[in-house]
Every structure is written in C-alpha cells, then in structure tokens.
A protein has these predicted regions:
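Catalytic machinery of carbohydrate-active enzymes
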Residues: 1-344
C-alpha cells in the first residue's frame, strides 16, 4: 500500500487506514491541531468496498448485515439523506442489520440525529475502529469523505448515496427517497403554548452563508408568510416583525428542531436540512437555492416548491463566506417577486 501525503489524507475519497490496521476518518484528523503518522487508503483492505475507487453492486436480498465505515457525513442535511439511503436498503431486505461507524469528532448536533435513528435505521459505533474487529465475511462499505467524490456534486444526493452503497437508484421507488423514516423517531413535545396551534416556520440560516437568506430579505419574507397564512411566523433568531416569534431558546437540540419542523403548517427556508426534515414529515415547503440546483436535493419531494437563483459563478459551490459571493446572493434576492412566490 502507498502512504498518502498530508493533503491526500485530508481530501481522500474514502476513509483511512493506519499501519496497524485502525480505520480513521479524515474529518477527525482535520479537527486536530496537527497529526502525524502514516495513513493509507482503506479501500480494498480486507475486502472493504469503496464506490469512488471501484464501482460495485450488491444484492442486499442475500446480505444479513452491512457495515458502513465513516457514514453518512458531518452535516445534518447530508446525514438525513444518507440515513434515507440506508433505510431504503430494506426495500430489498426488511431484516437487514446496518451498522454505521461514525467519525469520532463529528459535530454534536449532527450526532444527535444518529442517536435518534439508532435502533430505527442503524446501530452506531465510532471511529477509530480496528478493521479486524469486523468479520471479513460480512459486507463492509467505505462511504467516507463523500464531499470529495466527483459524483457528489453531479448527482441527486440520494442517488449518490445509493450508488455508494452498491444500489442502482432506479431500483428504489421515489416514495422511499423522501426521508419518511423520520416519522418513526421519538421527539419531544412542543412547548405548551404551541401545541395544537397553527404556525409557519421561517428558517433562513443554512450551514454556510452562501446558502443562507440575506438579512435584508428576512422581514419581507416573514411578511409574505403572514399575509399568506395569517398565523404566527416562528423562526430561529431575531426578525423585527409584529407577527414573528423567535423560538431559538426553545430549540436547543436536534430533536427540538425536528419537532418544530414536524408540526409546522408550512416551512420557508434556504436550509436544506429543514427541507429534508419537512419532506420526511410531509410538511409543505418553499425552498431557496443559490448555488446548488434544486433537482440535486428535492427531486423526490412532491410538497416542495423550489426557487432557484441561477448565479453562474456560484454554480455547485458548496460553501462560501466571501464578500463578493454574498453580495451576489443578496442581489439575487432583491429580484424576488414576493407576490409570485411559489407555494406548495
């Protein structure tokens, strides 16, 4: 095996292996101030499969267990779709046992989702993990560092994850691609004030400023929601509008966030995590996209109406906080015709 350079270690299309056979996530090394030692590609070791290294297919009807190394991302949105892909494997085999080996340093709010899904979609373990502790005869797939796989930016995300698991996406019905496994999760109740009361949800903040709704558009959009639905507009953070309520203090966990989305009458957002959650709970949504084509994220969501600002120089840019890029996004929102917003 060839030793990876330090750059290759961080941007490797998959997971890593130490000289003594321990599986490691690039993400975990990146979170450290520094790292040392030799690292190799995990792909192929002890029969571990990696679709970025060599495409493969699996007949899950004949598998009893699958081990997923370094799945399914370190953001909330990616993780929801990755878990949807894992749940979809039960279309072939309802009794399939799935075990995910998570990066040990993933953000806490993301891992909270996996804890909610534990025993529902998959069982959990954490990297680093000795490869030899996984029985060699059992199916083992490396899904790590997917952000650096070429197909990640060109395929609908659910199709990407299915291919990474060795499944032809067309073999899975669209109804199994809409995150409805989330309806099995045990969530906390809303505060008493909002139980059984109608509200709409405004979620303007995405994981990167590039995909967030500019502050200058918050009040106009909250007002559009109020005029459309005539019920309180709830959201996360301050907005100066008489019919808006900041519920940030009442949403301190990922489970809280899911519950607020689940019970909303409608969601208006640029946060794809909120879009994926709303789809899982069949909540109608209008979703703004600034750099990612909507069909790559919401193709299978019949209750989602996308608004796409096609900004050529930002096409497929995953993240940015550069002043010029954010000015382009803000300019795009000034062209928005609020009376022509698409509603699901």
């Amino acid at each position: 095996m060839e030793v990876l350079t330090k750059d290759e270690v961080l941007y490797h299309r998959g997971s890593l292996l130490t000289a003594d056979g321990v599986m490691v996530a690039s993400w975990d090394l990146e979170q450290q101030e520094s790292f040392s030692g030799d690292y190799f590609s995990l792909a192929g070791y002890r029969g571990i499969r990696n679709a970025a290294a060599a495409p493969f297919s699996v007949d899950y009807c004949n598998e009893s267990v699958v081990h997923i190394i370094n799945g399914m991302g370190v953001t909330l949105g990616d993780s929801i779709i990755g878990l949807t892909a894992l749940e979809a494997l039960r279309e072939f085999n309802p009794n399939l046992h799935t075990i995910i080996y998570r990066p040990g340093r993933a953000p806490h709010y993301v891992d909270q989702l996996y804890h909610l899904a534990a025993g529902v979609v998959a069982d959990l373990r954490w990297l680093p993990w000795k490869a030899e502790h996984i029985p060699e005869q059992e199916l083992c797939i490396d899904a790590g560092n997917q952000l650096f796989w070429p197909a990640f930016t060109t395929l609908p995300m659910i199709d990407f994850f299915l291919q990474a698991l060795g499944v032809e996406p067309t073999a899975i019905p669209a109804t199994a691609k809409a995150n409805r496994w989330m309806q099995k999760l045990c969530l906390p109740p809303l505060p008493e004030r909002w139980q059984n009361k109608p509200y709409v949800l405004f979620c303007p903040t995405a994981s990167t400023p590039l995909r967030s709704i500019p502050a200058s558009a918050h009040v106009p959009l909250v007002n559009a929601l109020w005029e459309k639905f005539a019920c309180p507009v709830l959201g996360f953070g301050a907005v100066d509008h008489p019919h808006y309520v900041d519920i940030q203090p009442f949403s301190t966990t990922t489970a809280d966030f899911l519950a607020w989305v689940k019970h909303a009458r409608y969601v208006l957002t640029s946060d794809t995590a909120a879009v994926h959650i709303a789809a899982g709970y069949d909540v109608p949504t209008t979703a703004f996209f600034t750099s990612i084509a909507p069909e790559l994220r919401v193709r299978d969501y019949p209750l989602c109406q996308p608004v796409y600002f096609a900004i050529p120089e930002l096409n497929n840019v995953q993240a940015s906080a550069r002043k010029h890029d954010l000015e382009q996004v803000e300019l795009a929102f000034t062209t928005l015709m609020l009376n022509e917003l698409p509603w699901a």
